[in-house]
UniProtKB/Swiss-Prot annotation:
The lineage of its organism: Eukaryota, Metazoa, Ecdysozoa, Arthropoda, Hexapoda. It is a multi-pass membrane protein. This is Sphingolipid delta(4)-desaturase DES1. Has sphingolipid-delta-4-desaturase activity. Converts sphinganine-containing sphingolipids (such as N-acylsphinganines or dihydroceramides) into sphingolipids containing the delta-4-desaturated sphingoid base (E)-sphing-4-enine (such as N-acylsphing-4-enines or ceramides), which are required for many different functions (structural functions as well as signaling). Required to initiate spermatid differentiation among other signals. Its main location: endoplasmic reticulum. It is found in: Endoplasmic reticulum membrane; Membrane; Mitochondrion. Its EC number is 1.14.19.17. It comes from Drosophila melanogaster. The keyword Oxidoreductase applies. The keyword Mitochondrion applies. The gene is ifc. Testes. Pathway: Sphingolipid metabolism. Disruption phenotype: Primary spermatocytes become mature in size but degenerate without initiating meiotic chromosome condensation in their nuclei. The mutation does not affect female fertility but leads to semi-lethality both in males and females during embryonic stages. Homozygous mutant spermatids show a misshapen Nebenkern, which varies in size and is associated with multiple nuclei. Keywords: Endoplasmic reticulum, Lipid metabolism, Membrane, Mitochondrion, Oxidoreductase, Transmembrane, Transmembrane helix.
Protein backbone atom coordinates (compact mmCIF):
# COMPACT_ATOMS: atom_id res chain seq x y z
CA UNK A 1 0.00 0.00 0.00
CA UNK A 2 3.01 2.28 0.38
CA UNK A 3 3.88 4.96 2.90
CA UNK A 4 1.10 6.48 4.97
CA UNK A 5 0.51 10.22 4.79
CA UNK A 6 1.78 12.27 7.70
CA UNK A 7 -1.30 14.48 8.02
CA UNK A 8 -4.30 13.29 10.03
CA UNK A 9 -6.54 16.32 9.51
CA UNK A 10 -7.14 19.22 7.19
CA UNK A 11 -5.42 22.58 7.72
CA UNK A 12 -8.06 24.50 9.67
CA UNK A 13 -7.73 28.28 9.59
CA UNK A 14 -9.79 31.12 11.02
CA UNK A 15 -8.97 33.83 8.53
CA UNK A 16 -10.88 34.96 5.46
CA UNK A 17 -9.88 33.57 2.07
CA UNK A 18 -6.95 35.67 0.82
CA UNK A 19 -8.10 36.73 -2.62
CA UNK A 20 -10.64 39.47 -1.87
CA UNK A 21 -8.22 41.39 0.33
CA UNK A 22 -5.35 41.01 -2.13
CA UNK A 23 -7.63 42.13 -4.98
CA UNK A 24 -8.35 45.34 -3.08
CA UNK A 25 -4.67 46.01 -2.39
CA UNK A 26 -3.62 45.32 -5.98
CA UNK A 27 -6.35 47.53 -7.46
CA UNK A 28 -5.38 50.38 -5.16
CA UNK A 29 -1.84 50.17 -6.52
CA UNK A 30 -2.68 49.21 -10.11
CA UNK A 31 -6.15 50.52 -11.01
CA UNK A 32 -5.36 49.91 -14.69
CA UNK A 33 -6.06 46.21 -14.12
CA UNK A 34 -9.76 47.10 -14.25
CA UNK A 35 -9.28 47.68 -17.98
CA UNK A 36 -8.64 43.94 -18.31
CA UNK A 37 -12.10 43.10 -16.95
CA UNK A 38 -14.72 41.87 -19.40
CA UNK A 39 -15.27 39.12 -21.92
CA UNK A 40 -12.86 37.85 -24.55
CA UNK A 41 -14.42 38.28 -28.03
CA UNK A 42 -12.11 35.62 -29.52
CA UNK A 43 -13.00 32.96 -26.96
CA UNK A 44 -16.14 31.68 -28.67
CA UNK A 45 -14.24 30.99 -31.88
CA UNK A 46 -11.51 29.03 -30.13
CA UNK A 47 -14.02 27.00 -28.13
CA UNK A 48 -16.17 26.42 -31.20
CA UNK A 49 -13.15 25.18 -33.18
CA UNK A 50 -12.41 22.61 -30.47
CA UNK A 51 -16.00 21.36 -30.53
CA UNK A 52 -15.86 21.05 -34.32
CA UNK A 53 -12.54 19.19 -34.11
CA UNK A 54 -14.04 16.60 -31.80
CA UNK A 55 -17.13 16.17 -33.98
CA UNK A 56 -14.91 15.57 -37.02
CA UNK A 57 -12.79 13.14 -35.01
CA UNK A 58 -15.88 10.98 -34.44
CA UNK A 59 -15.85 10.01 -38.12
CA UNK A 60 -12.28 8.75 -37.73
CA UNK A 61 -12.52 6.90 -34.43
CA UNK A 62 -15.61 4.93 -35.45
CA UNK A 63 -13.34 2.66 -37.50
CA UNK A 64 -10.55 2.29 -34.94
CA UNK A 65 -9.92 -0.83 -32.87
CA UNK A 66 -10.77 -0.48 -29.19
CA UNK A 67 -7.09 -0.36 -28.21
CA UNK A 68 -6.32 2.47 -30.63
CA UNK A 69 -9.53 4.23 -29.64
CA UNK A 70 -8.35 4.33 -26.02
CA UNK A 71 -4.95 5.65 -27.11
CA UNK A 72 -6.65 8.34 -29.19
CA UNK A 73 -8.95 9.21 -26.30
CA UNK A 74 -6.05 9.63 -23.86
CA UNK A 75 -3.58 11.38 -26.17
CA UNK A 76 -5.89 13.53 -28.27
CA UNK A 77 -9.60 13.59 -27.51
CA UNK A 78 -9.20 13.70 -23.75
CA UNK A 79 -6.95 16.75 -24.00
CA UNK A 80 -9.49 18.59 -26.13
CA UNK A 81 -12.33 17.56 -23.83
CA UNK A 82 -10.40 18.71 -20.78
CA UNK A 83 -9.76 22.01 -22.51
CA UNK A 84 -13.50 22.22 -23.20
CA UNK A 85 -14.16 21.66 -19.50
CA UNK A 86 -11.96 24.66 -18.85
CA UNK A 87 -13.87 26.53 -21.54
CA UNK A 88 -16.97 25.77 -19.47
CA UNK A 89 -15.05 27.19 -16.51
CA UNK A 90 -14.48 30.44 -18.40
CA UNK A 91 -18.13 30.50 -19.44
CA UNK A 92 -19.25 30.04 -15.82
CA UNK A 93 -17.74 33.47 -15.16
CA UNK A 94 -19.60 34.91 -18.20
CA UNK A 95 -16.28 35.58 -19.91
CA UNK A 96 -17.47 34.48 -23.36
CA UNK A 97 -20.13 37.15 -23.95
CA UNK A 98 -20.06 39.25 -20.78
CA UNK A 99 -22.49 39.60 -17.89
CA UNK A 100 -25.01 41.51 -20.01
CA UNK A 101 -25.73 38.42 -22.15
CA UNK A 102 -26.08 35.54 -19.68
CA UNK A 103 -28.06 33.25 -21.99
CA UNK A 104 -25.46 33.60 -24.74
CA UNK A 105 -22.95 32.27 -22.22
CA UNK A 106 -25.24 29.42 -21.15
CA UNK A 107 -25.92 28.35 -24.75
CA UNK A 108 -22.21 28.34 -25.57
CA UNK A 109 -21.77 26.27 -22.42
CA UNK A 110 -24.22 23.70 -23.80
CA UNK A 111 -22.26 23.59 -27.06
CA UNK A 112 -18.87 23.22 -25.36
CA UNK A 113 -20.37 20.51 -23.18
CA UNK A 114 -21.36 18.32 -26.16
CA UNK A 115 -18.03 16.50 -26.76
CA UNK A 116 -17.54 15.99 -23.02
CA UNK A 117 -20.39 13.47 -23.05
CA UNK A 118 -21.78 14.18 -19.58
CA UNK A 119 -24.01 17.20 -18.82
CA UNK A 120 -22.03 19.50 -16.55
CA UNK A 121 -21.90 23.10 -17.75
CA UNK A 122 -24.80 24.45 -15.65
CA UNK A 123 -24.05 22.34 -12.57
CA UNK A 124 -20.42 23.40 -12.70
CA UNK A 125 -21.36 27.08 -12.69
CA UNK A 126 -23.69 26.57 -9.74
CA UNK A 127 -20.97 25.11 -7.55
CA UNK A 128 -17.90 26.85 -8.94
CA UNK A 129 -18.96 30.40 -8.11
CA UNK A 130 -19.44 29.29 -4.50
CA UNK A 131 -15.93 27.82 -4.55
CA UNK A 132 -14.68 31.34 -5.28
CA UNK A 133 -16.81 33.15 -2.73
CA UNK A 134 -16.54 30.55 0.05
CA UNK A 135 -13.12 29.07 -0.63
CA UNK A 136 -12.34 26.44 1.98
CA UNK A 137 -15.79 26.49 3.61
CA UNK A 138 -16.34 23.01 5.03
CA UNK A 139 -19.99 22.80 3.92
CA UNK A 140 -19.99 24.83 0.70
CA UNK A 141 -16.69 24.41 -1.16
CA UNK A 142 -17.12 21.11 -3.00
CA UNK A 143 -13.58 21.29 -4.39
CA UNK A 144 -12.32 19.97 -1.04
CA UNK A 145 -12.17 16.18 -0.53
CA UNK A 146 -14.58 14.65 1.95
CA UNK A 147 -13.30 13.27 5.24
CA UNK A 148 -14.03 9.77 3.92
CA UNK A 149 -11.79 10.36 0.89
CA UNK A 150 -8.98 11.65 3.09
CA UNK A 151 -9.20 8.64 5.42
CA UNK A 152 -9.54 5.99 2.72
CA UNK A 153 -6.81 7.22 0.38
CA UNK A 154 -4.07 7.93 2.91
CA UNK A 155 -1.22 5.81 1.50
CA UNK A 156 0.95 6.09 -1.60
CA UNK A 157 -1.13 3.50 -3.46
CA UNK A 158 -4.32 5.00 -2.08
CA UNK A 159 -3.40 8.42 -3.43
CA UNK A 160 -2.61 6.85 -6.81
CA UNK A 161 -6.11 5.34 -6.87
CA UNK A 162 -7.61 8.64 -5.73
CA UNK A 163 -5.95 10.49 -8.62
CA UNK A 164 -7.25 7.89 -11.09
CA UNK A 165 -10.76 8.16 -9.64
CA UNK A 166 -10.83 11.97 -9.51
CA UNK A 167 -13.53 12.37 -12.18
CA UNK A 168 -15.97 10.33 -10.12
CA UNK A 169 -15.24 12.31 -6.96
CA UNK A 170 -15.84 15.55 -8.84
CA UNK A 171 -19.16 14.20 -10.10
CA UNK A 172 -20.51 12.81 -6.83
CA UNK A 173 -18.85 14.95 -4.13
CA UNK A 174 -21.24 17.93 -4.56
CA UNK A 175 -24.20 15.58 -4.05
CA UNK A 176 -22.76 14.64 -0.65
CA UNK A 177 -21.29 17.91 0.62
CA UNK A 178 -23.76 20.46 -0.71
CA UNK A 179 -26.70 18.88 -2.55
CA UNK A 180 -28.95 21.23 -4.51
CA UNK A 181 -32.19 20.60 -6.44
CA UNK A 182 -31.74 20.62 -10.22
CA UNK A 183 -32.60 23.85 -11.99
CA UNK A 184 -34.49 24.28 -15.25
CA UNK A 185 -31.27 25.02 -17.10
CA UNK A 186 -29.66 21.87 -15.71
CA UNK A 187 -32.57 19.83 -17.06
CA UNK A 188 -32.21 21.52 -20.46
CA UNK A 189 -28.46 20.86 -20.36
CA UNK A 190 -29.15 17.19 -19.68
CA UNK A 191 -31.75 16.87 -22.45
CA UNK A 192 -29.47 18.56 -24.99
CA UNK A 193 -26.54 16.35 -24.01
CA UNK A 194 -28.47 13.08 -24.06
CA UNK A 195 -29.97 14.00 -27.44
CA UNK A 196 -26.50 14.66 -28.84
CA UNK A 197 -25.22 11.36 -27.42
CA UNK A 198 -28.18 9.49 -28.92
CA UNK A 199 -27.56 11.04 -32.34
CA UNK A 200 -23.92 9.92 -32.22
CA UNK A 201 -24.95 6.34 -31.46
CA UNK A 202 -27.70 6.36 -34.08
CA UNK A 203 -25.56 7.66 -36.95
CA UNK A 204 -22.04 6.49 -36.01
CA UNK A 205 -22.40 3.72 -33.43
CA UNK A 206 -21.17 3.28 -29.87
CA UNK A 207 -17.43 3.67 -30.46
CA UNK A 208 -17.46 7.43 -31.10
CA UNK A 209 -19.50 8.03 -27.94
CA UNK A 210 -17.12 5.79 -26.00
CA UNK A 211 -14.22 7.83 -27.40
CA UNK A 212 -15.71 11.02 -25.99
CA UNK A 213 -16.61 9.58 -22.58
CA UNK A 214 -13.36 7.65 -22.13
CA UNK A 215 -11.35 10.71 -23.12
CA UNK A 216 -13.19 12.91 -20.63
CA UNK A 217 -12.70 10.43 -17.78
CA UNK A 218 -9.06 9.60 -18.51
CA UNK A 219 -8.05 13.24 -18.90
CA UNK A 220 -9.51 14.08 -15.49
CA UNK A 221 -7.47 11.40 -13.74
CA UNK A 222 -3.86 10.31 -14.18
CA UNK A 223 -3.12 12.72 -17.01
CA UNK A 224 -0.76 15.72 -17.25
CA UNK A 225 -3.54 18.23 -17.93
CA UNK A 226 -5.41 16.99 -14.84
CA UNK A 227 -2.50 18.08 -12.68
CA UNK A 228 -4.13 21.48 -12.33
CA UNK A 229 -6.86 19.97 -10.13
CA UNK A 230 -4.21 19.29 -7.49
CA UNK A 231 -1.83 22.14 -8.22
CA UNK A 232 -4.46 24.84 -7.67
CA UNK A 233 -5.30 24.48 -3.98
CA UNK A 234 -3.52 21.53 -2.35
CA UNK A 235 -1.14 22.82 0.29
CA UNK A 236 2.39 22.12 -0.90
CA UNK A 237 3.73 25.01 1.21
CA UNK A 238 2.30 25.82 4.63
CA UNK A 239 0.33 29.04 4.75
CA UNK A 240 -0.52 29.09 1.03
CA UNK A 241 -3.83 27.77 -0.26
CA UNK A 242 -3.74 28.77 -3.94
CA UNK A 243 -0.88 28.17 -6.38
CA UNK A 244 -0.14 29.22 -9.93
CA UNK A 245 1.58 27.35 -12.75
CA UNK A 246 3.11 29.31 -15.63
CA UNK A 247 4.19 26.49 -17.94
CA UNK A 248 3.28 25.61 -21.54
CA UNK A 249 0.14 23.62 -20.73
CA UNK A 250 -1.55 26.97 -20.14
CA UNK A 251 -1.61 27.33 -23.93
CA UNK A 252 -4.25 24.59 -24.21
CA UNK A 253 -6.12 25.24 -20.96
CA UNK A 254 -7.15 28.90 -21.20
CA UNK A 255 -4.40 29.88 -18.74
CA UNK A 256 -6.07 28.09 -15.84
CA UNK A 257 -2.59 27.71 -14.39
CA UNK A 258 -2.65 31.42 -13.52
CA UNK A 259 -4.78 30.44 -10.59
CA UNK A 260 -3.85 33.04 -7.99
CA UNK A 261 -4.44 35.66 -10.64
CA UNK A 262 -7.78 34.07 -11.56
CA UNK A 263 -9.04 33.95 -7.97
CA UNK A 264 -7.87 37.50 -7.38
CA UNK A 265 -9.58 38.71 -10.57
CA UNK A 266 -12.29 36.29 -11.75
CA UNK A 267 -13.67 39.04 -14.03
CA UNK A 268 -10.50 38.88 -16.15
CA UNK A 269 -10.62 36.28 -18.96
CA UNK A 270 -7.89 33.67 -19.08
CA UNK A 271 -6.28 35.26 -22.14
CA UNK A 272 -5.49 38.40 -20.10
CA UNK A 273 -4.31 36.79 -16.86
CA UNK A 274 -0.63 36.90 -17.93
CA UNK A 275 -1.03 40.68 -18.15
CA UNK A 276 -2.33 40.75 -14.57
CA UNK A 277 0.83 38.93 -13.48
CA UNK A 278 3.02 41.26 -15.53
CA UNK A 279 1.49 44.38 -13.99
CA UNK A 280 1.42 43.14 -10.38
CA UNK A 281 4.42 40.83 -10.57
CA UNK A 282 5.70 41.62 -7.07
CA UNK A 283 2.52 40.10 -5.63
CA UNK A 284 2.79 36.85 -7.59
CA UNK A 285 6.50 36.22 -8.07
CA UNK A 286 7.02 35.93 -4.32
CA UNK A 287 4.41 33.19 -3.82
CA UNK A 288 5.13 29.45 -4.18
CA UNK A 289 4.33 28.23 -7.68
CA UNK A 290 4.38 24.98 -9.64
CA UNK A 291 6.59 24.38 -12.66
CA UNK A 292 5.08 21.11 -13.89
CA UNK A 293 1.63 19.55 -13.55
CA UNK A 294 3.15 16.11 -14.12
CA UNK A 295 5.54 16.77 -11.22
CA UNK A 296 2.56 17.86 -9.13
CA UNK A 297 0.89 14.49 -9.70
CA UNK A 298 4.12 12.64 -8.85
CA UNK A 299 4.75 14.65 -5.68
CA UNK A 300 1.13 14.33 -4.56
CA UNK A 301 1.30 10.54 -4.83
CA UNK A 302 4.82 10.01 -3.49
CA UNK A 303 5.23 12.73 -0.83
CA UNK A 304 3.77 11.62 2.54
CA UNK A 305 3.34 15.27 3.54
CA UNK A 306 0.77 15.79 0.77
CA UNK A 307 -2.55 14.06 0.23
CA UNK A 308 -6.31 14.64 0.34
CA UNK A 309 -5.90 16.15 3.83
CA UNK A 310 -3.57 18.86 2.47
CA UNK A 311 -6.30 21.45 2.03
CA UNK A 312 -7.10 24.63 3.92
CA UNK A 313 -10.58 24.47 5.46
CA UNK A 314 -12.78 26.98 7.25
CA UNK A 315 -15.74 26.47 9.55
CA UNK A 316 -19.06 27.08 7.83
CA UNK A 317 -20.16 30.69 7.86
CA UNK A 318 -23.31 30.23 5.82
CA UNK A 319 -24.51 31.59 2.52
CA UNK A 320 -26.36 34.47 4.15
CA UNK A 321 -23.36 35.94 5.94
Amino acid sequence: MGQKVSRTDFEWVYTEEPHASRRKIILEKYPQIKKLFGHDPNFKWVAGAMVLTQILALFVVKDLSWSWLIVAAYCFGGIINHSLMLAVHEISHNLAFGHSRPMHNRILGFICNLPIGLPMSISFKKYHLEHHRYQGDEAIDTDIPTLLEARLFDTTFGKFLWVCLQPFFYIFRPLIINPKPPTRLEIINTVVQLTFNALIVYFLGWKPLAYLLIGSILAMGLHPVAGHFISEHYMFAKGFETYSYYGPLNWITFNVGYHNEHHDFPAVPGSRLPEVKRIAKEFYDTMPQHTSWTRVLYDFIMDPAVGPYARVKRRQRGLAS
